[in-house]
Curated annotation (Swiss-Prot):
Subunit-level organization: Monomer. Interacts with human CDC42.
Domain of life according to the entry: Bacteria
Biased composition (Basic and acidic residues): 241-253
Region ranges (Disordered): 241-261
Name recorded for this polypeptide: Guanine nucleotide exchange factor BopE
Cell compartment(s), UniProt: Secreted
A Gene Ontology molecular function term of the record: guanyl-nucleotide exchange factor activity
Family to which the UniProt record says this protein belongs: Belongs to the GEF (guanine exchange factor) SopE family.
Organism: Burkholderia thailandensis (strain ATCC 700388 / DSM 13276 / CCUG 48851 / CIP 106301 / E264)
Function: Activator for both CDC42 and RAC1 by directly interacting with these Rho GTPases and acting as a guanine nucleotide exchange factor (GEF). This activation results in actin cytoskeleton rearrangements and stimulates membrane ruffling, thus promoting bacterial entry into non-phagocytic cells.
Entry keywords, A to Z: GTPase activation, Guanine-nucleotide releasing factor, Secreted, Virulence
One cellular component term from this protein's GO annotations in UniProt: extracellular region
Primary location group: secreted
Length: 261
């Protein structure tokens, strides 16, 4: 698949063999990260367009309507809303894995782009999660966390730049496969379930499933790097959250001492 600037999209190009494809992609200049993300979403858009234009194949999950505490339709669990929504998220993950795993493994350039986009998504989500939490305001913990997070991202080999002494990946954002999973899940479950609060609560689960999907499709070295980065980010979050708690206690202690003086 080749980007055509005249039409603002991608066209299919026959390749003689996988080896030839790899050599050609190695010879091409490295595109900007924004262009890479555009290519990934273009692929996803083509697939989702087909999904919306055609009926679901036999055996695919039917849409579900709420009737009290039970759900009607085929190929679905009965019970509470959370159980039903989890079912459709899992089904969406299976469909995306079926569609994208061969592409990630066979298209070297696409696989690299998805890999880097997933690392950037982990970085962005961790930064937002930590810095938007009121519990991390105390002390000077947030800048220290961002600096440590940037060092961890740099160690993966991600493209990026130093901004005021802190490394920032050049393509921070949302995992494109998570976006595809969510859109597919929306289609499978229908508007009524998609509007329920249980669906929003399961988005963290869907994000983790998207990362697992990419990790399982990548070659061993990149899969290991992805797993190590996830673990490093979790460790950093736990460490700096404890530091924020300690700083908050110290500030409260100092304030109480001043009041008692």
């Amino acid at each position: 698949m080749t980007y055509n600037p005249r039409i603002g999209g991608f066209t299919h190009v026959k390749q003689a063999s996988f080896d030839v494809h790899v050599k050609r992609s190695e010879a091409r200049p490295r595109t900007s990260f924004a262009q890479q993300i555009k290519r990934i979403f273009s692929k996803i858009g083509e697939t989702l367009g087909q999904l919306f234009r055609h009926r679901a194949p036999d055996g695919a999950p039917g849409r579900v309507k709420l009737q009290g505490v039970r759900y009607v339709g085929s190929y679905r669990p009965t019970g509470d809303a959370r159980q039903a929504i989890r079912h459709f998220v899992d089904e969406a993950v299976k469909q995306v894995a079926h569609a994208r795993t061969p592409e990630i493994r066979q298209d070297a350039e696409f696989g690299r782009q998805v890999y880097e986009a997933t690392l950037c998504a982990i970085f962005s989500e961790a930064k937002d999660r930590f810095c938007m939490d009121p519990a991390t305001r105390a002390g000077n913990v947030r800048p220290a966390f961002i600096a440590a997070l940037g060092d961890a991202a740099r160690a993966t080999g991600l493209p990026g730049a130093d901004k005021q002494g802190v490394f920032t990946p050049s393509g921070a954002g949302t995992n494109p496969l998570y976006t595809e999973i969510r859109l597919r899940a929306d289609t499978l479950m229908g508007a009524e379930l998609a509007a329920r609060p249980e669906y929003r609560e399961l988005q963290s689960y869907a994000r983790q499933q998207a990362i697992d999907l990419v990790a399982n499709a990548l070659p061993g070295e990149r899969s290991n790097t992805l797993a190590e980065f996830r673990q490093t980010v979790q460790t950093l979050e736990a460490t700096y959250r404890r530091a924020a708690q300690d700083a908050s206690r110290d500030e409260k202690g100092a304030a109480n001492a001043a009041d008692g003086a």
